[in-house]
């Protein structure tokens, strides 16, 4: 039986039509008994969605990757891809990362816009794809999927990742693999919670629900009132995590990133986004690099010799 080769059939098609083409191709190839195998190359997550919807049981997805002179092929799990597509918050972005050199998971679209702009200020050639996972609980499963697909994956998250011990443990374990380092960062995280609780007169353990007044300390001005030794430990923990690819914003929430530099902390406001872009556009790389939270973020993205 013949083998059929098809190169980028989605070329020049809008996304909805690329998806429809995938559905039609999948259905027709399955019904065509004269064919032995069909090989389709694509750069379209929409064509891929169409193929998956029409012939998932007959489909084998292979991701090709080139790193310098090295080339490798990775067979992806259909079960994992179907699980990803079945998520209630599924976006084509999740599959777009299959065609990218690197995925950067962030909490929401605003985060993606700001961090993309910020990193491009230091590296205009950065080609990683910023993927919004709609909140911290999405980090773990999507990071695991990209790991299994052979895609380099980083995470940028607000500081309040640390206010939930369980989520912090599961996400940080994806980046920190040695028990001694895991125990080290967990002890720092727990010491920080104890301090915030004592500061507000709300004693309790990790299993007790954290009062909102305690949670507020994770939102912005997170170093305020911290003892020097605890502040140093938190800083060292954040730098360690960043070097491994997990960036925890040391200023608190995204909206606190430029707060100390005149960009007012405003929760859920488009005005903040406009002001943040204006701030980045009007300040040099050296000035941006002097912001502590930015300096930590750069450890995950910019080689040390280029950081200045």
Question: Where are the model-predicted features located?
Answer:
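Switch/communication elements of ASCE P-loop NTPase nucleotide-binding domains
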Residues: 1-96, 299-307
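Acidic, Mg2+-coordinating catalytic modules of nucleic-acid enzymes
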Residues: 87-105, 109-308
């Amino acid at each position: 039986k013949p083998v059929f080769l098809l190169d980028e059939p989605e070329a020049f098609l809008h996304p909805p039509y690329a998806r429809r083409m995938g559905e039609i191709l999948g259905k027709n190839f399955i019904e065509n008994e004269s064919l032995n195998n069909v090989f389709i190359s694509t750069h379209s997550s929409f064509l891929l969605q169409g193929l998956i919807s029409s012939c998932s049981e007959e489909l084998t997805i292979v991701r090709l990757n080139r790193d310098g002179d090295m080339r490798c092929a990775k067979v992806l799990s259909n079960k994992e891809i179907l699980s990803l597509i079945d998520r209630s918050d599924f976006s084509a972005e999740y599959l777009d990362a299959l065609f990218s050199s690197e995925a950067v998971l962030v909490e929401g679209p605003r985060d993606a816009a700001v961090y993309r702009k910020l990193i491009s200020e230091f590296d205009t050639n950065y080609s990683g794809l910023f993927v919004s996972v709609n909140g911290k609980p999405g980090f773990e499963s999507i990071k695991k999927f990209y790991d299994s697909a052979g895609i380099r994956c980083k995470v940028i998250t607000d500081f309040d990742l640390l206010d939930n011990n369980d989520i912090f443990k599961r996400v940080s374990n994806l980046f920190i693999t040695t028990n001694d380092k895991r125990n080290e960062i967990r002890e720092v995280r727990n010491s920080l919670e104890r301090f915030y609780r004592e500061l507000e007169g709300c004693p309790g353990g990790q299993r007790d629900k954290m009062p909102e007044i305690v949670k507020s300390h994770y939102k912005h001005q997170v170093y305020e009132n911290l003892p020097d030794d605890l502040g140093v430990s938190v800083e060292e923990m954040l730098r360690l995590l960043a070097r491994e690819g997990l960036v925890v914003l040391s200023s608190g929430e995204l909206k606190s990133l430029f707060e100390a530099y005149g960009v007012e902390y405003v929760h859920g406001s488009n005005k903040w986004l406009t002001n943040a872009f204006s701030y980045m556009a009007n300040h040099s790389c050296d000035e941006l690099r002097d912001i502590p939270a930015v300096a930590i973020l750069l450890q995950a993205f910019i080689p040390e010799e280029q950081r200045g």
